[in-house]
Design a protein with these regions (language model features):
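Interdomain regulatory linker/hinge segments that flank or connect interaction modules
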Residues: 8-16
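Translation machinery proteins
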Residues: 16-70, 91
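Short, Lys/Arg-enriched, disordered terminal segments
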Residues: 1-2
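Active-site regions of enzymes building and remodeling cell-envelope glycoconjugates
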Residues: 75-81
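Long, charge-patterned amphipathic alpha-helical coiled-coil/hairpin "stalk" segments used as oligomerization
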Residues: 82-163
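Short loop/helix-cap segments at secondary-structure boundaries that form the rim of catalytic
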Residues: 69-75, 95
């Protein structure tokens, strides 16, 4: 299918649908053919920026040390300082992961982030990802990153050829 056919199909679906009393959303399902997902190099992990924001506000948590604490307090929904990592147990990390959509981490403390949060965030696919721009230097400005994460969506194939 080309872009015009896809846009036309979406327009028809929206026009023919009956009026709802809630905010509707569209789900896009893509079937991929000719991929062997048992091979690591054929798996897909991409972060795609959308032209408009998603329906809800994306919650961002910063995992930082003292260098970014003022910027994180101003721009992110929550933050965890390097000094507080030792106080966090597995239960607290799970609660934090439930209420967070993206984690942003400072690059120079990534080994400590992986050591503390890796067992909980790793299997959930929530570790700070450099592909999404979630691993930042100690001098980074978090405001444009948080704004970009509001429009970002993650696409991943695990064991099925459907996205």
């Amino acid at each position: 299918m080309n872009n015009k056919e896809i846009i036309q199909a979406i327009k028809e679906a929206r026009e023919n649908a009956k009026e709802r009393k809630f905010t509707e959303s569209l789900d896009l399902v893509i079937n991929l053919k000719g991929l062997n997902l048992k091979k690591e190099d054929e798996k897909i992990l991409a972060f795609i920026p959308l032209p408009h924001q998603r329906g809800k506000k994306v919650k961002v948590t910063a995992l930082i040390d003292q260098a970014l604490v003022t910027k994180a307090k101003a721009d992110c929904d929550e933050h965890a300082l390097l000094e507080d990592f030792k106080k966090l147990d597995k239960k607290a990390i799970k609660k934090l992961a439930k209420r967070t959509d993206y984690f942003v981490a400072q690059a120079n403390i990534m080994p400590k982030v992986a050591q503390t949060f890796g067992r909980v965030l790793g299997p959930r696919g929530m570790m700070p990802n450099p592909k999404a721009g979630c691993v930042v230097p100690p001098t980074a400005d978090l405001k444009p990153l948080v704004a970009r994460l509001q429009n970002l969506v993650r696409i991943e194939t695990k064991n099925e050829q459907t996205i």
